[in-house]
Each structure stands twice: as C-alpha cells, then as structure tokens.
C-alpha cells in the first residue's frame, strides 16, 4: 500500500491528509472493480468485527456487513436494544471489553465525543458509521461517485452545492472533505443552518492550503451557478422531534432541489446526489404525513428530479459498500 493506515481509527476526515483520503477513494475504486470482475482477494479472513448501532440504519449496516463478508470477516450486530452501553456500562468500559474480543468496531450513534472515546480506549480500529456531527464514510462514497460521473475531472476541479440544512453531519463532512481535497463547495441554506463557525474557520484554513473554495450563501441562484453536482439531505435529521417539522419546512422550502434549481446551474449535465433516505414522494409513512400536512409531494427534492436522468443517488448508495470496504481493508487488512 502506498500509505500505511493499519490500526488507524476512521472517526472524521479532519484526521486524514489529502493524500490519505485520495488513497482510500482509489482503493475503493480498485475493490469495486475486483468485485465486479470476480477477482476480489479476502484481506480480512479470520477477523471479527462488531457493529454498534445506537441509531437505525439500512445503507450503513448493509454496507458494513456485505463489505466484511466479501473480505472474509465475521460480524456481530449490536442494535439499540442489544447492549448496556451508556445505561449500565460506560463507553470507556465497553470499548475495553469489545477491544479484547474484536479486531475492529463500527459505531453509529449520537455525539462525536462517544465514538472518539470508543476509539481512544478500544485498542483496535474504530470506524464512524455516523454521529450527530460527522458522517465520514458517506463522503468517501460521495467523492467516488463524483469521480465516476465527472468525465475524467479530478476532485479539485469539481464544483458542487449542498442545499438545505448545512449544519448537519453530512453538511459538516462535505465541507471538511471538500476543503481537504481542494474542491469548490457552496453551502446553500438559511444562515441559521450553516455549519458551526469554528468548523467553518478550520475548513477555510485547510482550503487555503489545498486551493479549495468554501462559499456560504442564502442565495440559491448564486450558490448553484456552474455546479457539476447538487446535493441535499433530509431537512429533519434522526433524533430530532416531530415538532421541528413546521419551522423547518417553512425555512427550507426555498432550498428544495427541483428542476428549476437544476436549470439555474446552467449545466445541462448537472447531477443530483442525496445520501438517502429521501422524502421525494408520499409513498412512505412520513412522506404521506408531510404531504397531508404541508401539501407537498416531496420535501428536499421533487420526485421529478429524484427519478430523472440527473439523479445518481443509487450509484452513490452502492458506493457506500465499496468505500467502507476500503476503510476496513486499509486499517485492518492483512
């Protein structure tokens, strides 16, 4: 390997250099090709991996499980009701127990401080599957997907906008990733929902070194002009109360990704991205409740955009598995 990431935690992109992030993306692409070609080599044979989920998941759980199985590892799923973490046992103690039994641990849950403590005391690689502050494995998948749909452009040549709630874990992580990779990112949404000022300042300092550009704006037309990709996420994140919907929908409605917004990019080949799940119609319980209450079929993105040729959301979802596999192989593989 060009970089030795063995035994490293993967907790947030701030911990990794530009070259290390690019290495993980390149490794993801190689592993994806090998899986499709049937030439994959098992680098995790004999490894045991714990998957701690304090929040529900579809893509992240499936991606970790399939990636581990492909590479020859065994997994144990520990769900929200399947452990004593934080109730009868501290994370510090849990980390030291699981670290004696497992070769690697994934955590998906709440505060970043929790996964940082797990990483500090486990003694084995710990991977962040999502916290309230950061979602680093998602961003690796996003950047691999962008490269696959950029006609040979490097990441540093890509312009993209994130619309909506830019202070959530995906908005934060996209900003960090873009800064690290020297990209042009525009965070487009109400100022009250921009990322924390300290994180913005840290990313601006990184971007100054890498040649990246970070723009925060409430102006949709200004934010999306010339973009190669438009990205959005749900307006109310996991763990937030249903009461948050009324205020949030009123604030975020101008930042819905619809065909008019795509046209404002001036790029007929612009692509649409979303980390999923998405509220793009009324075919889910929550989607129907929203449609009935607000008269909107689709919130952060319209059905027309989601199902259009511009949408690459399922390529993006698949790439969760390839990039997670790369993280595990790089940090734990033989």
UniProtKB/Swiss-Prot annotation:
Pathway per the UniProt entry: Amino-acid biosynthesis; L-arginine biosynthesis; L-arginine from L-ornithine and carbamoyl phosphate: step 1/3
Binding residues annotated for carbamoyl phosphate, in chain numbering: 57-60, 84, 108, 135-138, 275-276, 320
One Gene Ontology MF term: amino acid binding
Residues that bind L-ornithine: 169, 233, 237-238
GO biological process: arginine biosynthetic process via ornithine; citrulline biosynthetic process; L-arginine biosynthetic process
NCBIfam families for this protein: orni_carb_tr, PRK04284.1
Family: Belongs to the aspartate/ornithine carbamoyltransferase superfamily. OTCase family.
Protein name per the record: Ornithine carbamoyltransferase
Taxonomic source organism: Vibrio vulnificus (strain CMCP6)
UniProt lineage: Bacteria, Pseudomonadati, Pseudomonadota, Gammaproteobacteria, Vibrionales
